[in-house]
Curated annotation (Swiss-Prot):
PROSITE patterns: RIBOSOMAL_S19. It comes from Epifagus virginiana (Beechdrops). Keywords: Plastid, Ribonucleoprotein, Ribosomal protein, RNA-binding, rRNA-binding. This is Small ribosomal subunit protein uS19c. PANTHER family: RIBOSOMAL PROTEIN S19P FAMILY MEMBER, SMALL RIBOSOMAL SUBUNIT PROTEIN US19M. Protein S19 forms a complex with S13 that binds strongly to the 16S ribosomal RNA. It holds the Pfam family Ribosomal_S19.
Length: 94
């Protein structure tokens, strides 16, 4: 289901990613697709596939659903892991 605002824009999908998904759809197979393309837009042919998206350190697998259509792949993978402030750091206090 594509929402109307996304139809007005030209959607960017990396060519290698689109080719891999088309090949898997033709074979009717489900495999994990590894990609570094966080800027690619999710399109309806991706629904039901597992795409492993790079977060800068590792690839995190994401299952694509119909609610994700129109969003970018990078929106669903966090790049920063906040570990909290240091508890016993008295040097920064006065």
């Amino acid at each position: 289901m594509i929402h109307s605002p996304t139809l007005k824009k030209n959607l960017f999908v990396a060519n290698h990613l689109r080719a891999k998904i088309n090949k898997l759809n033709n074979k009717k197979k489900k495999e994990i697709i590894v990609t570094w393309s966080r800027a690619s837009t999710i399109i309806p042919i991706m629904i039901g596939h597992m795409i492993s998206i790079h977060n800068g350190k590792e690839h995190l697998p994401i299952y694509i659903t119909d609610h994700m259509v129109g969003h970018k792949l990078g929106e669903f993978v966090p790049t920063l892991n906040f570990r909290g402030h240091a508890k016993s750091d008295n040097r920064s206090r006065r």
